[in-house]
Amino acid sequence: ADQPLTITFKAAKSSDLYGYKGDVYLHIGIVNEEAWLFVPAEWNENIDKCKMTSEGNNCWSISLSPSIREWFASGETPVNELGIVIRNEDGTKKGTDTDFYIKVTDNKYQMFQPAPIKEKAMPAGTREGINVNADYSVTFAFYDKDKNGKHKDFAHIVGDFNDWTPANDETSQMYRDNANGCWWITLTGLDSDKEYRFQYYTGMRDGEIIRIADAYSEKILDPDNDKYIPESVYPSSERVYPEGGRGIVSAFKINQEPYSWRNEFSLKDKDNLIIYELLLRDFTETSDISGALGKLDYLKSLGVNAIELMPVQEFDGNDSWGYNPCFYFALDKAYGTKNMYKRFIDECHARGLAVIFDVVYNHATGSMPFAKLYWNRTDNKTAENNPWFNVDAPHPYSVFHDFNHESELVRSFVKRNLEFLLDEYHIDGFRFDLTKGLTQRECTEATVADYDAGRIRILKEYYDVVASVKPEAVVILEHFCCDEEEKELAGYGMKLWRDANNAYCQSGMGWKEYSDFSCLYTGTNSMKYGGYVGFMESHDVERVAYKALTYGNGAIAKNLSVRMSQLAVNAAFCFTVPGPKMIWQFGELGYDVTRGTEDNKMEKKPLHWEYYTEPERKGLYDVYARLLNLRVTHKDLFQNDAIFSWNVTENYWSTTPRSLTLKNGAEVMYVVGNFGDKETGPLLLPDGIKYDYMTGRELEGTVSVPAHGLLLATSFQP
């Protein structure tokens, strides 16, 4: 560390810098507990100090002199390792795909030297995470046995209670309980009303040292992202980052602020759910829970009976769909405080609205403590010996880092998280993201949907936990696998997403090709009644109204009134089909902003609440509301014993329009949809049909349905 160092880089033919003629810069820092310290320049900052000298022949060099320590001006900080990236002027080209590291000997300043391991069994009843004991002491425990049964050489806790400094004493050094694979420590004398922040300091004596937050934390603090959260969403006084922390830290308080639940709620009919899929970020101007609270009466008036929140467990950054989770027991501060989430759920229950959490157990980001514990920093992915994660996903659809659900460690974690969310937040069920990926079978796009007994076993195990805590809770899977597998899961009690977007986009645009709706009904392939959660739109597919506006046939694209009428016909042939249904937010107003491409689909979308004041769009909303109200006021038509039939293939369109009939006892409903641009001929009404449900007028004999028009006729008065 007190000698000069010359770094020479020669670009291989495979390097982005091979043949490069511009300036090349060194991005470098002293690596200490994962952090890069004393970095001379930001990534996009070019300074002479870091400019490398071209030696010709694809070779560059730079000298750190008069010594490494002096070049960095690092003072008394130990210098044991350097992290290095070679880049061009704007950082778009790198010398190597991965960062590389140089070990350095420092004979002057030493890192903290952990004492030998102290072995001791954990107190009875201790679980991984933060355990508040009856005497107000707190026991901390984390598991670290790798896939080969080995563990870290040491573990200490650092935090507000010991000035963030590891020490070989009872305030910091953790005991080893090898039988349970855990490090643990009990701290006493803590202030029960004070919030404490902490991390685990762990590693190998001759290798990497890391600091991690607790994977079971119910609150974390993020130095890179919390500062951008508005004061109105999460008070800055409750997210003060500690001076001694590095990276994400855990936070806890013995006496947490209680929430007094005011409303008892139980989900009564899982087979008749009308779910509103909602992304808090894009739902109101404030992009938070408070904003959504102000719209609950709007949703109640619409007629939905459940809200499915897109992922709200802590995710990387603040601006996201949420499918990049990192901490599963903490809800993301970008939307509000813990008690604000509870209030939102409580207020939903007060209005008879169930709350479903969209949860992501297929993968996690590299910020997740389990990923960080055993990490391959050269390849920037989880290491071979990581007991929770696969190095690479065995299936073709994964992102970030793929959980191995055949691992008992993973399944125990997921089950505990499901129990926690149900108990702590009183939610009414889950939508599991990408359950097709919960497999260890090596597969391709062509084979991933094949019957997989292992995947089924895992999902049944998770379902059993949910049912044991709250039997009435719903479990919905984004699965998209073969019928045999989906039927087995539905038979066990779960529900499967049923994507009919393409067909309803086609009909919404006025094109009959590929517009067959048959897949939406469980009776089409003998699926268990209520087994499908059918939808025209979800967060992940294109908006029907956008396609109608952009690619609509004739007047559909050119005339707003015609377009909204066509979408109303669409809605009638979705929401009158028995079984659970889902609406993507603002579909009821004909939201016609594109989802975007695969590259930009997750970007924030513009709000158009003014649509509600436009007569044509308000008309569509009113049709939705009437259809959904029908499901409430005449529930018998939507039960398993009702007689259902429909004609919705490409053979039925305009001259011979599409139709749907539901009958249970004396109640009959008859729906006719004219998706074409010409009025139908006279249509003979079925026996018993007397009223136009949408207008209240009496009917008899025959009726004609106008172009882009809808008839919903019933045997009973509206």
What function would you assign to each model-found segment?
Residues 220-221, 257-273, 279-427, 434-451, ...:
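Substrate-binding/active-site clefts of carbohydrate-active enzymes
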Residues 399, 434-448, 531-560:
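Active-site clefts of carbohydrate-active enzymes
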Residues 5-11, 667-674:
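Short, well-ordered beta-strand segments enriched in hydrophobic/aromatic residues
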Residues 18-76, 89-100, 141-193, 203-225:
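Aromatic-rich carbohydrate-binding modules that target alpha-glucans
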Residues 313, 321-324, 351, 434-535, ...:
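Active-site-proximal helices and loops of the catalytic beta/alpha 8
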Residues 109-155, 211-271:
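Basic K/R-rich, polyanion-interacting modules in nucleoproteins and related proteins
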Residues 193, 706-710:
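Tight coil/turn sites that cap or link beta-strands
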